[in-house]
């Protein structure tokens, strides 16, 4: 009485069409075919992006934590979009000045915010072409411009 999937010798078309229609319920498939990574994400589908620092800000972490997470507001060079990026490690905000060029990378899970920092989807990797980690470990100095 129409229970289960067709299993006959001539059922390939039916199975194929059924699978094709139902794949649209899968998030990754839909995202890939519609190209939403290129349309909606600020990076335009790439893993990193350069930008200019507009301002420094402290964002309060979500409950139950209590902290002020150090972030910067950045305008991307490639498309002019403004994003908020987290500055990792203790005291690294001192290496970042306004109007500096920074390299941003993703931060968190599949384009969503990470941990207790609301609405922050990116982190700072380089400042003025120098790795933020190298500056923090005092292995390199920021170039004077």
Curated annotation (Swiss-Prot):
TM regions (residue ranges): none
Record-listed cross-link Glycyl lysine isopeptide (Lys-Gly) (interchain with G-Cter in ubiquitin), residues: 56
3,4-dihydroxyproline sites (modified residues): 64
Subcellular localization, as worded in the UniProt entry: Cytoplasm
InterPro entries xrefs: NA-bd_OB-fold, Ribosomal_uS12, Ribosomal_uS12_euk/arc
GO biological process: maintenance of translational fidelity; maturation of SSU-rRNA from tricistronic rRNA transcript (SSU-rRNA, 5.8S rRNA, LSU-rRNA); regulation of translational fidelity; translation
Effect of substituting residue 65 to A: Lethal mutation
Keyword terms, alphabetized: Cytoplasm, Hydroxylation, Isopeptide bond, Ribonucleoprotein, Ribosomal protein, Ubl conjugation
Keyword Transport belongs to the record: no
One GO location term (cellular component): ribosome
Principal subcellular localization: cytoplasm
Other comments on record: Present with 10600 molecules/cell in log phase SD medium. There are 2 genes for uS12 in yeast.
Family recorded in the similarity comment: Belongs to the universal ribosomal protein uS12 family.
Described function: Component of the ribosome, a large ribonucleoprotein complex responsible for the synthesis of proteins in the cell. The small ribosomal subunit (SSU) binds messenger RNAs (mRNAs) and translates the encoded message by selecting cognate aminoacyl-transfer RNA (tRNA) molecules. The large subunit (LSU) contains the ribosomal catalytic site termed the peptidyl transferase center (PTC), which catalyzes the formation of peptide bonds, thereby polymerizing the amino acids delivered by tRNAs into a polypeptide chain.
Protein name: Small ribosomal subunit protein uS12A
Lineage, highest ranks first: Eukaryota, Fungi, Dikarya, Ascomycota, Saccharomycotina
Chain's gene name: RPS23A
């Amino acid at each position: 009485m129409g229970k289960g999937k067709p299993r006959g010798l001539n059922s390939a078309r039916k199975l194929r069409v059924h699978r094709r229609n139902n794949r649209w319920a899968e998030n990754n498939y839909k995202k890939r075919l519609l190209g939403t990574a290129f349309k909606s994400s600020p990076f335009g589908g790439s893993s990193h992006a350069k930008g200019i620092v507009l301002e420094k800000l402290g964002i309060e972490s979500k409950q139950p934590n209590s902290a002020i997470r150090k972030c910067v507001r950045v305008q991307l060079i490639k498309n002019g979009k403004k994003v908020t990026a987290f500055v990792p490690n203790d005291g690294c905000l001192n290496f970042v000045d306004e109007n500096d060029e920074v390299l941003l990378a993703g931060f968190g899970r599949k384009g969503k915010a990470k941990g207790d920092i609301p609405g922050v989807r990116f982190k700072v990797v380089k400042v003025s072409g120098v790795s933020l980690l190298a500056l923090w470990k005092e292995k390199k100095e920021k170039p004077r411009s």
